[in-house]
Amino acid sequence: MMHAEIVSIGDELLKGQRVNTNAASIAAMLSLEGVPVRRITACSDREEEMQEVFSEALGRSELVLVTGGLGPTRDDRTRNAVLKLLNRGLTLDPGSLREVELRVFARGREMTELMRSQAMVVEGSLAIPNTKGTAAGMILNCGPRFSERHLVLMPGVPVEMQAMMEGTVLPWVRERSGTTIIHTPVKTIGVGEATLAEMIVSVEDALPEGTTVAYLPHGAGVDVMVSTIAEARERAEEDNAAVAGAISRLAAEFVYAVGNRSLEETILDMLRGQQETLAIAESCTGGLVASRITDVAGSSGVFTGGFVVYSNIAKEVQLGVSPGLLDAFGAVSQEVARAMALGCLRRSGATIAIATTGIAGPGGATPDKPVGMLALGLARRTAGSQGPHVESSVLYMHGDRHQNKLRFSQAALRMLWEALRRSGSSSE
């Protein structure tokens, strides 16, 4: 199995002036390819230190990926450090030169020697095209001194590194791995990591050889990543699908997707399948729920529109919420959330509406209504003449203003998903 190390170059990383997001991104991408990362190192711009770090890394790992220090400025010394380490020279890469010329001429500038130097690569390397910038990347076989191990050099600009990894480095890694790796996320909402682990313990106790399960909690829920590595693709796919399927059955009430689908995409599919249309009324989330829904292409087919009603006056004028209700219960209450959802339903023409009202913080709290309190309302048209179905709930979050708004929006989407799941199950 191929093992990797990541080396991030730059004094700015060691001084805390910049967060090393490149290393995290590369490690995640390699993990998905079944290549474990043994070590991540940050190194200064000094050539002597780079040579030492590169030499040690190549002594441990078959693949060393380096970001940073390939630009045209004086502190970009990575290429020189590699030249000295491997005792090689530079050569001009025609393909990289064309990329540089296209970018320079497109900006109406003249080609300079400094710009031309960005297309110089270490002798014997495979040049990596830079489709987002000018500095060429490269993949080098480091020769018998380092047991034919490989060094990958990429710029430190995240968008340039990302393009090189996806376009050249990862395909190159796949060609040499000799195995197939399959990843399937089982996405859940409304259940904690520990509870979820208890639910699927029987699956984890009987995993096929080469299959692992990882829990990935985040602000929106917990993803269970099922990973399978095998020499034969057919076996990898079969084992992976079997485990992902077993997990989704055991945790069915919390699973909203198996595979790379978002909660928003799942909800929109459910709305289409049940021939429903959606409208949203928001106070504390300030349009975030509607923004998340409309981030999905094709949402216009089921999303009719929304109301951002931050003040009490807006709630009264736009949604018809009673001033007496607001006075009696306050804006952050189940009663007002229900009235907001009903008003949204009636004034939008949609068949289902959700509403949010809460206290994101840091101010606005009262003794009985703390920061993080959220009231949700949902109204839905029903067949016959009995009027809309209305429900509400209260939740409490713990976070700063930004975190609370995100969690409020997630709670609203969860309420909508649960309502659609119930109606979908009853119609089967």
Curated annotation (Swiss-Prot):
Transmembrane segments: none annotated. SMART domains: MoCF_biosynth. Pfam families: CinA, CinA_KH, MoCF_biosynth. CDD domains: cinA. Belongs to the CinA family. HAMAP family: CinA_B. This is CinA-like protein. It comes from Chlorobium phaeovibrioides (strain DSM 265 / 1930).
